[in-house]
């Protein structure tokens, strides 16, 4: 494949690691050390891109001479940003609120070449329309898909979360999982990495 610089995925997300593994190229995952608190007045796409860039930049000291991938996703609905519920009670409340609503997911990916300083950036917008949900269906879903509490809006689309979704509009179906793979492949090619 001719990969000269090591490839590092800056994430603690098991879902993003799985997405990278499916590409079949050698990489190392490393947890970034970066404050992910949204800034006041920041739009969802701005937050996603700032966090993706920050994650990549936070790893430059540990991985000089590398290609570093940073990614983040921010959901937007009802005039505010939504994150990961992180526990069952929050997931139940979140899914009840989002029932029947349209959610915009902004998935940002960056590729930083630490040798040249060049950074490739992209934000992918995915629109998800949730089905009308009741408490019983939400409880059953969360019992069968416990990892959903670690997903944005508790909607694990690559698993049983697909049952909660009425419609998805996207140019890259991978972006909703957390990593816009189509654009990442382009970025890697631009840096001399052929994934095939």
Swiss-Prot record:
Pfam family, one: Maf
SUPFAM superfamilies noted in UniProt: ITPase-like
PANTHER family to which the protein is assigned, alphabetical: BIFUNCTIONAL DTTP/UTP PYROPHOSPHATASE/METHYLTRANSFERASE PROTEIN-RELATED, BIFUNCTIONAL DTTP_UTP PYROPHOSPHATASE_METHYLTRANSFERASE PROTEIN-RELATED
Native organism taxonomy: Bacteria, Pseudomonadati, Pseudomonadota, Betaproteobacteria, Neisseriales
Similarity comment: Belongs to the Maf family. YceF subfamily.
Catalytic activity: N(7)-methyl-GTP + H2O = N(7)-methyl-GMP + diphosphate + H(+)
Names of required cofactors: a divalent metal cation
Annotated site, Important for substrate specificity, chain positions: 15, 73, 158
Catalytic-site annotation from UniProt: 72
Protein name: 7-methyl-GTP pyrophosphatase
InterPro entries associated with the record: ITPase-like_fam (IPR029001), Maf-like (IPR003697)
Location in the cell: Cytoplasm
Species name: Neisseria gonorrhoeae (strain ATCC 700825 / FA 1090)
Keywords linked to the UniProt accession: Cytoplasm, Hydrolase, Nucleotide metabolism
One GO-annotated biological process of the protein: nucleotide metabolic process
Any one GO cellular component localisation term in the record: cytoplasm
Known EC number: 3.6.1.-
């Amino acid at each position: 494949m001719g990969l000269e610089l090591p490839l590092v995925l800056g994430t603690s997300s098991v879902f993003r690691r799985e997405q990278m593994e499916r590409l079949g190229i050698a990489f190392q995952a490393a947890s970034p050390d970066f404050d992910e608190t949204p800034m006041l007045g920041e739009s969802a796409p701005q937050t996603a891109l700032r966090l993706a860039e920050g994650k990549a930049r936070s790893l430059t000291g540990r991985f000089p001479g590398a290609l570093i991938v940073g990614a983040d996703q921010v959901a937007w609905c009802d005039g505010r940003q939504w994150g990961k519920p992180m526990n069952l009670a929050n997931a139940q409340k979140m899914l009840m609120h989002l029932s029947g609503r349209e959610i915009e997911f902004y998935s940002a990916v960056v590729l930083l070449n630490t040798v040249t300083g060049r950074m490739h950036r992209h934000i992918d917008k995915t629109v998800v329309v949730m089905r009308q949900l009741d408490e019983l269906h939400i409880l059953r879903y969360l019992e069968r898909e416990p990892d959903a509490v670690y997903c944005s809006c508790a909607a694990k689309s690559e698993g049983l979360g697909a049952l909660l979704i009425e419609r998805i509009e996207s140019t890259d179906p991978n972006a909703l999982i957390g990593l816009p793979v189509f654009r990442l492949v382009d970025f890697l090619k631009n840096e001399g990495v052929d994934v095939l």
